[in-house]
C-alpha cells in the first residue's frame, strides 16, 4: 500500500512541535480529561501550542477542554500534555485522537497516561474516588483501526491483552498507598455520548462487568496499543451513574465534582513520575 494514501499529519506535527521545543523528546504523553487540566500548571520550562496549529489534533468543542499541547518537565520527566481531548460525539468518528497519539509515538514517547472524568457503576466508589483502569468494554461503534492499515505504525491485527499495563498499575497502587488514599482498579465501559446513559444501559453495564463509564479513553488506548505505546489510565469519579443516585447528571456537575479528586490526582501522577524518573 502506498504511503501516499495515508495521512502525513503526524509528520507535520512533529516538525511544528520541534520548532517550539527543539531537541526535546518526551517520555510520557498525558491526556487530561474534563476538569483535570490543573496538572499542566505543574509543568516546568513549559511551552504551549494550540491544537489549531497542529494538523489532525482535535479542536475540542467541550467546555473544560483547553485545546492545547503543553511540553516541558514534570518531576524531572520530559512530558507532552494534552489539555483536553476529542470525543467520538464531536463528529470526527473513532479516529479523532489517532493523529495525536501517532505524533507522540514519532516524538519518542514510551508511555501514554490517559485520564478522564467518569461515572461510577459501583455504589461503594463515589465521587472524588480515583480508579486505575485494568481493562475496557467498548460499546462505541467500531474502533479507530477500521479501514486501511497504516503499517508505518503497526500491524493489521494486534492484541489488547494487558492494554492497561499491569506493572504501571502496580506502581500507581504503591504511590497511592504512600500518599494515603485508596486507588480502586476497574473495567472502563466506553459510551458514545453526548447524552448520558439510561438507567437500563447502566444496569446492562454492571451485568457485563463494568466498573466505570465514560465517553472517551477507548479510541486513544486502541490507537496507542496499535503503535506499541504502553498505556496507563486513571478515571476521576465525578458522579454515580444514572439510576444509582438522585443527582441530576450534567457537564457542569462533572466539572465541579472533578475538583474533589484534584489534589489526590496530582499527587498520584507526580509520585508516579518520580518513581520512573
Each model region followed by its residue ranges:
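His/Asp/Glu-rich mid-to-C-terminal helical/loop segments that flank catalytic regions of hydrolases
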Residues: 242-277
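Active-site/ligand-binding-proximal alpha/beta "capping" segment
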Residues: 175-211, 269, 276-277
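Short acidic/polar active-site loop segments enriched in Thr and Asp
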Residues: 110-111, 211, 230
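Zn-dependent metallopeptidase/amidohydrolase metal-coordination segment
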Residues: 215-253
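Histidine/lysine/aspartate-rich catalytic loop segments that bind and position anionic ligands
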Residues: 141, 148-194
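Metabolite-binding pocket within alpha/beta catalytic cores that recognizes anionic/polar moieties
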Residues: 2-160
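Generic non-transmembrane alpha-helical segments
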Residues: 16-23, 167, 171-181, 267-275
Amino acid at each position: 500500500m502506498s504511503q501516499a494514501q495515508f495521512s502525513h499529519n503526524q509528520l507535520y506535527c512533529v516538525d511544528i512541535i520541534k520548532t517550539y521545543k527543539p531537541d526535546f523528546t518526551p517520555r510520557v504523553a498525558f491526556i487530561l480529561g474534563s476538569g483535570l487540566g490543573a496538572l499542566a500548571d505543574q509543568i516546568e520550562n513549559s511551552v504551549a501550542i494550540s491544537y489549531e496549529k497542529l494538523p489532525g489534533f482535535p479542536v475540542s468543542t467541550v467546555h473544560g477542554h483547553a485545546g492545547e499541547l503543553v511540553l516541558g518537565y514534570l518531576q524531572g520527566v520530559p512530558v507532552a500534555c494534552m489539555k483536553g481531548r476529542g470525543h467520538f460525539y464531536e463528529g470526527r468518528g473513532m479516529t479523532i485522537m489517532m493523529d495525536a497519539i501517532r505524533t507522540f509515538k514519532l516524538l519518542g514517547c514510551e508511555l501514554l497516561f490517559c485520564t478522564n472524568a467518569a461515572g461510577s457503576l459501583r455504589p461503594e466508589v463515589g465521587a472524588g474516588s480515583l480508579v486505575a483502569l485494568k481493562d475496557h468494554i467498548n460499546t462505541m461503534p467500531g474502533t479507530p483501526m477500521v479501514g486501511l492499515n497504516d503499517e508505518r505504525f503497526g500491524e493489521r491485527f494486534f492484541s489488547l491483552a494487558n492494554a492497561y499495563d499491569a506493572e504501571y498499575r502496580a506502581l500507581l497502587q504503591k504511590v497511592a498507598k504512600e500518599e494515603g488514599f485508596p486507588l480502586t482498579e476497574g473495567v472502563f465501559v466506553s459510551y458514545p455520548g453526548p447524552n448520558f446513559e439510561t438507567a437500563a444501559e447502566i444496569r446492562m453495564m454492571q451485568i457485563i462487568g463494568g466498573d466505570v463509564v465514560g465517553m472517551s479513553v477507548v479510541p486513544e488506548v486502541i490507537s496507542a496499543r496499535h503503535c506499541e505505546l504502553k498505556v496507563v489510565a486513571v478515571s476521576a469519579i465525578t458522579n454515580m451513574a444514572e439510576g444509582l443516585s438522585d443527582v441530576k447528571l450534567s457537564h457542569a456537575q462533572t466539572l465541579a465534582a472533578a475538583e474533589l479528586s484534584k489534589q489526590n490526582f496530582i499527587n498520584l501522577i507526580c509520585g508516579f513520575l518520580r518513581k520512573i524518573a
